[in-house]
Amino acid sequence: MKSPGAAPAPGLVAAFRALHHDRAPEDPLVLPGPWDAGSARVFVEAGFPALATPSAGVAASLGYEDGATPPDEMFAAVARIVRAVSTGDRPVPVSADIEGGYGLAPAELVERLLDTGAVGCNLEDSADGALKDPHRHAEWLAEVRAAAGDRLFVNARVDTFIRGVTDPAEAIVRARLYVAAGADCVYPIGAPPEAIPALRAGIDGPVNVGAAPGGAAELAELGRLGATRVTFGPGLQRQAMAAVREGAARLRS
């Protein structure tokens, strides 16, 4: 079953790709993570030029644990988010976290994504708690790129840090393979701030850094360290739920 939606306009994908280049060091691309249509509109109203869905945040909004969302529900949720920010004459590009691709063949995965209207995707390189073979994963990413052409921005997640491999050199090896395979950006999730300069120096392409939601000064510092773009995973969704819990508690007090 395909999610309702329409493929993004080529110009929207190109605009999203351009946001990752020629940025001042202290001005990384900040991509809030909407978990539903309402939160997406809030972020757009705040002036953000693009969004990136977090799979864990979307899962929580649908009542699932992270990693347990059925693919049809994830694609449908992404389509709703895209639709919510595509009204009017200035649609906002949305990139979708689709975890490990849900076992779909590259061509089918690309078409499912395009059906949602997303301009890009996150694809991770671990499964069932273990890192994938980087060469095989790079081959798979190359198939995704071949199927997508320039219609999708591919953000290749590198999971070494969250799988206990703390040496940035290991992340760089994987990142280089993925960039050579056609990834537009790499995301060494869980990289500590002190590792960012080495990652920046060793990777030929945009680098996504994950962060806790913070202020402009913290984001600028990540940019100076080498982050091209900053995302927050489910952090904003969890902040929102904390506020809901606080409000619920007040109703009972």
What function would you assign to each model-found segment?
Residues 2-234, 238-246:
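Alpha/beta enzyme core
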Residues 245-253:
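C-terminal segments
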